[in-house]
């Protein structure tokens, strides 16, 4: 009888240990190999309203981007898919132009820690149709837009550091897919990182994306009650 009780006790302890063990983390989904369609974008955007970007290196901190899935479904869904698969992890901000923009998203920076001939030319292997800014959207300070090169626009994006509406509209079309709503001070710190040449903007100290988390949480509520 004693041995039976001991076996029962061992089995109970094992069962409790199994129940208390942390479940294995869910592996990230595979990264996309082609641009999203409007149909596929809808499913991707169902629970994607906010992107929280954590950076390390010369600047430590995080900032959050309110995503404009309704206004720019293709660009937003593509960004969300790349963020969820871990594409941006390890990529650094390769273009820092004070008073203009900070830009990131070139996967080539994962294997380089300084300037090289193809810096700023990398992408995920595909591009997609540029979506003109929706009515009411402007290239305001802290607006977030995709690059407009047909290769780079697959993954590269930038944050405006000033009112660039007139400047960028005269230069071309850049899809606005979000706006920084939390962590503006982190953006300002990145913009202040020393660079090789103020006209080129390659940083002398790296600011690297550690992760981007996508959530359904809306941005902070403004003083007038709007979000």
Question: Which ranges hold each PLM region?
Answer:
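Bacterial N-terminal signal peptides
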Residues: 8-17
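Cyclophilin-like peptidyl-prolyl cis-trans isomerases
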Residues: 19-227
């Amino acid at each position: 009888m004693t041995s039976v009780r001991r076996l029962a006790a061992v089995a109970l302890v094992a069962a409790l240990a199994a129940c208390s063990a942390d479940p294995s983390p869910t592996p990230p989904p595979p990264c996309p190999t082609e641009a999203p369609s409007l149909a596929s974008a809808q499913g991707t955007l169902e629970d994607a309203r906010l992107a929280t970007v954590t950076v390390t290196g010369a600047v430590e901190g995080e900032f959050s981007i309110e995503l404009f899935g309704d206004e720019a479904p293709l660009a937003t869904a593509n960004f969300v898919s790349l963020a969820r698969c871990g594409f941006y992890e390890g990529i650094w901000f390769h273009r820092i132009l004070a008073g203009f923009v900070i830009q990131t998203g070139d996967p080539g920076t994962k294997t380089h820690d300084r300037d090289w001939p193809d810096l700023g030319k990398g992408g995920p292997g595909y591009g997609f149709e540029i979506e003109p800014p929706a009515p009411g959207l402007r290239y305001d300070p802290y607006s977030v837009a995709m690059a407009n090169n047909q290769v780079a626009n697959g993954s590269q994006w930038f944050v405006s550091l000033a009112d660039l509406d007139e400047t960028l509209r005269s230069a071309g079309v850049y899809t606005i897919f979000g706006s920084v709503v939390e962590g503006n001070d982190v953006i300002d710190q990145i913009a202040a990182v020393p660079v090789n040449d103020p006209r080129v903007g390659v940083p002398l100290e790296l600011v690297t994306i550690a992760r981007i988390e996508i959530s359904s949480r809306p941005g902070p509520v403004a003083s007038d009650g709007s979000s």
